[in-house]
């Protein structure tokens, strides 16, 4: 029997260091990051592959965020590595300005992989002049499907400030080309006994699935000005910690040990209070762990809907002739409502007259919240006939309100996720402001936005908000959404099949929730380490 050959493309992880970078800032040091572009095709179009994090005030940065790229043996993959000092989001080489660039290095992926230890060290240049050195290390990723979840604390760490320290730690995986940074913790201020939040890493990022691969944990004291102070380090591997062979590790500072000779014991002790392998958390893991789902409904009250009292109005609504708004509320709300933890749904209006003037975000009805889908439909039927419609169709205020409210009380130990259902009949009048609010919400708010288009409009702007075309949503200042949080569906495409409407509008919610949780390193509460 012939063994089937896997046709999946290998994936390669690229990690980076730089040194001796030219300083582009006047009053401080540059804030470098590395952007990677893949030059493809006969016309040489440069495709954005990924970028590292930005490291502030550092001319010798060591980046913890890697860039992942598919490896095509059969193709020449010309890669450009551009070191920049920049604040705005960039996705195209053409968007870079000359004064943003510290330096650039171009090579092929094949050249990096074929080098001894899969490592390249080269000068970077800008306008023909050397402006620093870049070090690129490559490693093929072996997908494991597991995560390494651990929690550590420290005791009696060395004082590096007057009375205390501000400790943080770095994890390096060893390789034939040297140690490679794979994780850096947050700084805990003013303590010699730090207690860190749980950390979850993909096993392939930590050790590429090799449970005996040596890991180096370095502890440092953070200084806001000047160089950070080294506290000490220890080495171990995942197998040792998982099996509980050793859970306590003394931090050793070799220079301090040499000075103090026989009197030196350690520079503190690090304890793994728990450690385990877990699968990638699922949407159900978060729900069963206690993550609350909250539903908000926003109803378009603009004049383009037509007077609710006329039969041609999109808001014309009777028990025997429910409007498209009512049908959408019932269809989508019936699926979402069972997940709403307390059964209360907030109903908002926008584009109508509220308290004497046009409002783009107001309480729809006499109650701030109503019970279930039935309550939403009852409120809609009571309020819409007497609603004074206005204009224009603005989304900014509604999205801003929902984004802020979704953050109320949300922590890793109190997880909530909000779904904002917007029902609208027309094109957005405040497109730039709306895009800005969505981009901002994608970075910080536990929020998904479901938009249902009512009526016969073309909804071109709505399709732009929905990132399903593969292009990340970018606002006028160049900031790009870190996750896709918008799903748009025209009601008329599914008017004959309400179940299909709900399926289409809600199918991306699980991945959007997972995106927020991963972005913030929130574990399912049932997975949390004590």
Swiss-Prot record:
UniProt GO MF annotations: calcium-dependent phospholipid binding; metal ion binding
Domain C2 intervals: 1-125, 130-253
PROSITE patterns: C2 (PS50004), VWFA (PS50234)
Cofactor: Ca(2+)
Any one GO BP annotation for this protein: cellular response to calcium ion
InterPro entries for the chain: C2_dom, C2_domain_sf, C2B_Copine, Copine, Copine_C, VWF_A, vWFA_dom_sf
Domain VWFA: 294-513
Binding site for Ca(2+) 1: 25, 31, 85, 87
UniProt entry keywords in alphabetical sequence: Calcium, Metal-binding, Repeat
Gene Ontology CC annotation, any one: cytosol
Binding site residues for Ca(2+) 2: 25, 85, 87, 100
Family note: Belongs to the copine family.
This protein's name: Copine-B
Protein encoded by which gene: cpnB-1
């Amino acid at each position: 029997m012939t063994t089937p050959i896997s046709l999946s493309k290998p994936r390669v992880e690229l990690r980076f260091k730089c040194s001796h970078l030219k300083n582009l800032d006047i009053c401080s040091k540059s804030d470098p990051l590395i952007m990677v572009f893949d030059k493809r095709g006969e016309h040489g179009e440069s495709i954005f592959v990924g970028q590292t994090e930005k490291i502030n005030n550092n001319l010798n940065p060591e980046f913890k965020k890697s860039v992942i790229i598919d490896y095509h043996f059969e193709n020449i993959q010309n890669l450009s590595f551009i070191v920049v000092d920049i604040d705005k989001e960039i996705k195209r080489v053409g968007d870079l300005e000359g004064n943003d660039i510290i330096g650039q290095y171009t090579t092929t992926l094949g050249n990096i992989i074929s080098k001894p230890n899969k490592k390249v060290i080269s000068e970077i240049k800008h306008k023909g002049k050397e402006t620093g050195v870049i070090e690129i290390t490559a490693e093929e990723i072996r997908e494991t499907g597991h995560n390494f979840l651990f929690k550590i604390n420290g005791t009696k760490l060395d004082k590096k400030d007057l009375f205390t320290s501000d400790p943080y730690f770095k994890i390096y995986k060893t390789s034939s080309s040297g140690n490679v940074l794979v994780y850096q913790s947050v700084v805990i201020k003013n303590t010699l006994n730090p207690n860190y939040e749980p950390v979850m890493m993909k096993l392939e990022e930590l050790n590429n699935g090799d449970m005996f691969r040596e890991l180096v944990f370095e502890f440092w004291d953070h200084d806001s000005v000047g160089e950070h102070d080294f506290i000490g380090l220890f080495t171990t591997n995942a197998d040792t910690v998982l099996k509980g062979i050793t859970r306590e590790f003394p931090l050793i500072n070799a220079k301090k040990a040499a000075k103090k000779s026989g009197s030196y014991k350690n520079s503190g002790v690090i304890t793994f209070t728990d450690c385990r392998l877990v699968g990638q958390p699922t949407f159900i893991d978060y729900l069963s762990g206690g993550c609350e789902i909250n539903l908000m409904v926003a109803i378009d009250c603009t004049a383009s809907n037509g007077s609710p009292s006329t039969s041609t109005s999109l808001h014309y609504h009777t028990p025997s002739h429910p409007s498209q708004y009512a049908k959408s509320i019932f269809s989508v709300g019936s699926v979402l409502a069972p997940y709403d933890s307390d059964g209360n749904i907030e109903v908002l209006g926008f584009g109508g007259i509220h308290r004497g003037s046009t409002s783009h975000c107001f309480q729809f009805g006499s109650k701030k919240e109503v019970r279930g889908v039935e309550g939403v439909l009852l409120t809609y039927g009571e309020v819409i006939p007497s609603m004074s419609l206005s204009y224009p169709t603005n989304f900014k205020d509604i999205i801003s309100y929902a984004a802020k409210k979704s953050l109320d009380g949300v922590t890793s130990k109190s997880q909530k996720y909000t779904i904002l259902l917007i029902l609208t009949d027309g094109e957005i009048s405040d497109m730039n402001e709306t895009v800005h609010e969505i981009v901002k919400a994608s970075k910080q708010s536990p929020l998904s936005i479901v938009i249902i288009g009512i009526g016969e409009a073309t909804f071109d702007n709505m399709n732009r908000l929905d990132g399903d075309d593969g292009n990340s949503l970018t606002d006028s200042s160049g900031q790009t959404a870190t996750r896709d949080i918008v799903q748009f569906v025209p009601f008329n495409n599914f008017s004959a099949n309400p179940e299909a409407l709900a399926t289409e509008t809600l199918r991306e919610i699980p991945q959007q929730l997972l995106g927020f949780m991963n972005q913030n390193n929130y574990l399912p509460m049932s997975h949390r380490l004590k």
